[in-house]
Amino acid sequence: GWINKDLPKYNIKYATSADGYDWNRDGKVSIELEENETALARPCVIIENGIYKMYFSYKDPSIGYRIGYAESTDGLSWTRIKLNELGVSKVGWDSEMVEYGFVFKHNDVKFMLYNGNGYGMTGIGYAIER
């Protein structure tokens, strides 16, 4: 295998658009990478009770992808909150990694669709917030 391979690092940045087609990007980072992380991806933001809630994927090469969580009062400055992260199962199709969550509400119940091991090759599942 390769040793000390420099991998690209990806974070989540802020952009605005008046029409959803033309975007203004000023380079402002919304979520910073933590020490062992190499990538942040696929943010999904919902607003509940005036709080912006972001679910995003993060990659730590030692554990693979996980789904992280952050909150904001203005949609610009975000604070990561470890308590609300979705972890992996003990065994099965999502026991190695979970990623690319999409959160939505239906009949006042919050659901998350997400991919399992192998970026979803072993399955796609859902979680319900309790």
Annotate each PLM feature.
Residues G1-R130:
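Carbohydrate-active catalytic/glycan-binding domains of CAZyme proteins
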